[in-house]
Amino acid sequence: MANSSPVYDWFNERLEIQDIVDDISSKYVPPHVNIFYCLGGITLVCFLIQFATGFAMTFYYKPTVVEAYSSVQYLMTDVSFGWLIRSVHRWSASMMVLMLILHVFRVYLTGGFKRPRELTWVTGVTMAVITVSFGVTGYSLPWDQVGYWAVKIVSGVPAAVPVVGDFMVELLRGGESVGQSTLTRFYSLHTFVLPWLLAVFMLAHFLMIRKQGISGPL
């Protein structure tokens, strides 16, 4: 690399950074690719915004049935730019779902799910389910009237499943009724379990795209 700095040369000698950069920058991009092929990348950007703003809110949010609502109000009214952080979190959540839907439609309409990219499609659909789960679990965290009744209805849906329905309901709620255990479980899912799951499937998704390349035109 021409005119590289001594620091860059030191790292490049040990990590072969330039080889990685050359491999990424020389990847072939088919001529039929247009702006609609950026929808997946926009979805990723929305997720990163979600991660950053969500992490910021964990400094103030208190996952208890007594303090959850008041902690959200404190974030919105007393914390500097707290209202902006939460608003960006909500807006980017809606944008992420919208971009995800459009991305799925684009892949389906252009045949990007066909052989040999079936597993890429499967990981994408799995991430779509995880994204919806983010919405369900996050909706309940303010623990206001809307959040409480939403989690009560959602957690009661598995009761219709034969044999294991009641067990699934109790597993989600942490007991027979909606309460502190329910909020704790939804908070854990929203801030720990689902982000890690999404990160794992996202990594697999990108590695397969990297390996197989962008699908050709129909």
Curated annotation (Swiss-Prot):
Binding locations of heme c: C38
Subcellular location: Cellular thylakoid membrane
Binding positions (heme b 2): H89, H190
Transmembrane segments: 35-55, 93-113, 119-139, 189-209
UniProt key word ATP-binding: no
Cofactor binding, per record: Binds 2 heme b groups non-covalently with two histidine residues as axial ligands. Binds one heme group covalently by a single cysteine link with no axial amino acid ligand. This heme was named heme ci.
GO cellular component: plasma membrane-derived thylakoid membrane
Organism domain of life: Bacteria
CDD domains cross-referenced by the UniProt entry: Cytochrome_b_N (cd00284)
Gene Ontology BP annotations: photosynthesis; respiratory electron transport chain
Keyword Nucleotidyltransferase: no
Keyword line: Electron transport, Heme, Iron, Membrane, Metal-binding, Photosynthesis, Thylakoid, Transmembrane, Transmembrane helix, Transport
Topology within the bilayer: Multi-pass membrane protein
Cofactor needs: heme b; heme c
Amino acids binding heme b 1: H103, H205
GO molecular function, one term: oxidoreductase activity
InterPro entries: Cyt_b/b6_N, Cyt_B6_PetB, Cytb/b6-like_sf, Cytochrome_b_N_euk/bac, Di-haem_cyt_TM
Subunit structure: The 4 large subunits of the cytochrome b6-f complex are cytochrome b6, subunit IV (17 kDa polypeptide, PetD), cytochrome f and the Rieske protein, while the 4 small subunits are PetG, PetL, PetM and PetN. The complex functions as a dimer.
NCBIfam families the record matches: PRK03735.1
Further facts: Heme 1 (or BH or b566) is high-potential and absorbs at about 566 nm, and heme 2 (or BL or b562) is low-potential and absorbs at about 562 nm.
Family matches, as HAMAP family: Cytb6_f_cytb6 (MF_00633)
Purpose of the protein: Component of the cytochrome b6-f complex, which mediates electron transfer between photosystem II (PSII) and photosystem I (PSI), cyclic electron flow around PSI, and state transitions.
Protein name: Cytochrome b6
Encoding gene per record: petB
